[in-house]
Amino acid sequence: MSGKNEFNIFKHVLVPEHRILSEEEKKALLEKYKITPAQLPQIRASDPAVKALGAKPGDIIEIKRRSPTAGVYYYYRVVVED
């Protein structure tokens, strides 16, 4: 045991699902909306969810949220250096 407290951030009820898009998914997303990664909202590499996923700068994260009024919706963020 490392002596370090381990906490799985994704098991918390308030943290939505996160995943890293594959290169094919990333390309399809950017083409669909006719945008560049620089036009996406940013998320820092030091964000606990990004660290838990092992994402690196340039990766695009898909975040799946649930809403009682809107149902399920997705949004995307590009990982940037701190």
UniProtKB/Swiss-Prot annotation:
It is an enzyme of class 2 (transferase). Pfam families: RNA_pol_Rpb5_C. It catalyses: RNA(n) + a ribonucleoside 5'-triphosphate = RNA(n+1) + diphosphate. PROSITE patterns: RNA_POL_H_23KD. It is found in: Cytoplasm. Its EC number is 2.7.7.6. The keyword rRNA-binding does not apply. Belongs to the archaeal Rpo5/eukaryotic RPB5 RNA polymerase subunit family. NCBIfam families: PRK09570.1 (NF007129). Part of the RNA polymerase complex. This is DNA-directed RNA polymerase subunit Rpo5. The lineage of its organism: Archaea, Methanobacteriati, Methanobacteriota, Thermococci, Thermococcales.
